[in-house]
């Protein structure tokens, strides 16, 4: 039994089963057993899960990215600005937002890899900078379909098709498109980590950076790639967030990094780097998603949910240290 508990996947599954058992016990008069509850949980956790995909790559390199929430907010505002106000085609707006997110991530990675700035400091600076960019390009206001005319009245623009698509449900309204995007991001990360040379580089850099350097691994390029991909996934999440809210809010995404980090840590990816996987992050997303949903259907307030999430992060980190 002890040997099995040494497996991160087993421990993550035990945590998920425990949370599901709580849901079955405190089922809010049967609400937990309805498919709508599970569908809505998947839709809610998908944006956080997409952020956690990028964070998983960064944390395996022994880094951290505190800017994911702000980059989500920046790209959501940029997407709304390009689509709702400038009325650009989705074929131009989507790639532009994805490139902007990836570029911001590469800047963080470059500061860390080339200038030896601590990941905490570099991404903290990017967190503040990206929030500032979101407020700057939006003028501090939400970008919605309501457009102010010179005479003081409002004109309501049509919702772009890409917004409607990202906010839709398929298969008889049973699966949200954003959930499928989350699963696609999981698949992309799995391919990177399991099938590509750069995935092995990411593990090598996180396991022992100096040994990786002496073995010929391009350490700086690997770190820039990991943070660039994190920024890319932030942009994907930003597009989904803007479509779900039908607006670009410069304040959106605040504290999202807390939930995304919790998903990665609870899944079992080691904060010290070198160990972990995207499958564990998926289990962590399900655990956090179900935990929040169970608290929600049982009318536990937001304050209680936030405090519980913080306590779970501390518990997961202490458990990792105990295992050593």
What annotation goes with each model-predicted range?
Residues 12-25, 55, 128-134, 179-191, ...:
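Hydrophobic core segments of alpha-helical transmembrane domains in multi-pass membrane transport
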């Amino acid at each position: 039994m002890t040997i099995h508990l040494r497996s991160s996947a087993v421990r993550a599954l035990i945590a998920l089963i425990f949370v599901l058992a709580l849901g079955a016990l405190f089922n809010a008069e049967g609400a937990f057993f309805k498919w709508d509850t599970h569908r809505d949980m998947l839709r809610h956790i998908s944006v956080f899960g997409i952020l956690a995909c990028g964070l998983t790559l960064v944390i395996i390199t022994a880094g951290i990215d505190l800017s994911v929430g702000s980059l989500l907010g920046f790209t959501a505002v940029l997407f709304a600005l390009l689509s709702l106000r400038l009325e650009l085609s989705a074929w131009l707006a989507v790639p532009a937002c994805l490139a902007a997110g990836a570029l911001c991530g590469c800047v963080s990675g470059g500061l860390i890899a080339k200038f030896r700035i601590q990941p905490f400091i570099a991404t903290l600076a990017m967190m503040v900078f990206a929030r500032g960019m979101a407020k700057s390009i939006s003028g501090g206001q939400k970008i919605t379909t309501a457009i102010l005319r010179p005479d003081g009245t409002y004109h309501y623009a049509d919702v772009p098709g890409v917004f409607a698509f990202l906010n839709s449900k398929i298969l008889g309204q049973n699966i949200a498109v954003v959930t499928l995007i989350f699963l696609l991001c999981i698949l992309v990360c799995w391919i990177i980590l399991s099938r590509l040379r750069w995935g092995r580089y990411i593990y090598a850099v996180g396991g022992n950076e100096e040994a990786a350097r002496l073995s010929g691994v391009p350490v700086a390029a690997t770190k820039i790639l990991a943070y660039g991909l994190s920024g890319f996934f932030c942009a994907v999440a930003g597009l989904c967030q803007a479509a779900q809210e039908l607006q670009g809010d410069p304040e959106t995404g605040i504290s999202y990094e807390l939930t995304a980090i919790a998903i990665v840590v609870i899944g079992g990816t080691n904060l010290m780097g070198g160990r972990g996987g995207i499958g564990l992050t998926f289990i962590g997303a399900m655990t956090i998603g179900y935990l929040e949903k169970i608290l929600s259907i049982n009318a536990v307030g937001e304050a209680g949910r936030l405090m519980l999430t913080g306590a779970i992060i501390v518990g997961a980190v202490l458990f990792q240290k105990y295992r050593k």
